Amino acid sequence: MSKQPSLAQLKQDLADIADLNDSRLASLAADSRKGAQLLLKQIQHRLAKAEAAEQAFQARLHYERPFWARGERVAGIDEVGRGPLAGPVVTSAVILPPDFDIPLVNDSKQLTAKERERLYPLILAQAQSVSIGIGSPALIDQINIYQATRVAMQRAVLGLGLAPQQLIVDAMQIPVDVPQIRLIKGDAKSASVAAASIVAKVYRDHLMATYDELYPGYGFAQNAGYGTAEHLQGLADRGVTPIHRRTFSPVQKILQA
């Protein structure tokens, strides 16, 4: 009778299983050892999770596929930074290829900072074109945050190296002469918008980290310009910086004091 492989050896040998129908799982199921049964459950859980992630990713390509089938380029557009008291609103436009294959690309808010940082260069490498559009604090104060976001999105679209035939936008209408699909929570429904949300978020986070070095004491690297206790204390102690939005209430109160 042949000796059973050790559990450590089994774990190593079965690490490459990528399909629930793999015949090796049947052999593992027949192994009565408690550790083998635990390993079976772990593998089944991993594969089920991966399959669910793949199905969700394919669902996020639903809006792009009809246009790709006609050979049209689709740009996803999203923004980050509408709510902070400091820093610009940053938008991104991303044109993905029809063979785009990074299943983890999802709404940036559902990803950790580490995951976003890992996905950022992968998106840049696979995308056909990527552009950033910025609405400065001065522009926000001049025309309000909603209109500044629209202008920033317009800049992102016009900055693309390739002309898109279709836009998928997260809940806004952009002033450009290109057909648009407006999606509520588009960053969770469209891979193109999700990619744009990640690019915009990582870009803005890096920018705010730079501002943190220029204007220490507000916690910009940690709070990204949002009105945290540290940020509000910095405003009270140090006053308003050139990157603060002067029409936003807490900043306005400091200026009027």
Curated annotation (Swiss-Prot):
Enzyme class: hydrolase
Catalytic reactions of this protein: Endonucleolytic cleavage to 5'-phosphomonoester
Cofactor binding, per record: Manganese or magnesium. Binds 1 divalent metal ion per monomer in the absence of substrate. May bind a second metal ion after substrate binding.
Entries under PROSITE patterns matching the protein: RNASE_H_2 (PS51975)
Principal subcellular localization: cytoplasm
Binding, a divalent metal cation: D78, E79, D170
Domain RNase H type-2: 72-257
A GO biological-process term: DNA replication, removal of RNA primer
Keyword annotations of the record: Cytoplasm, Endonuclease, Hydrolase, Manganese, Metal-binding, Nuclease
Domain of life according to the entry: Bacteria
Enzyme Commission designation: 3.1.26.4
Cofactor(s) needed for function: Mn(2+); Mg(2+)
Annotated family: Belongs to the RNase HII family.
Free-text function comment from the UniProt entry: Endonuclease that specifically degrades the RNA of RNA-DNA hybrids.
Protein name: Ribonuclease HII
Organism: Levilactobacillus brevis (strain ATCC 367 / BCRC 12310 / CIP 105137 / JCM 1170 / LMG 11437 / NCIMB 947 / NCTC 947)
Gene: rnhB
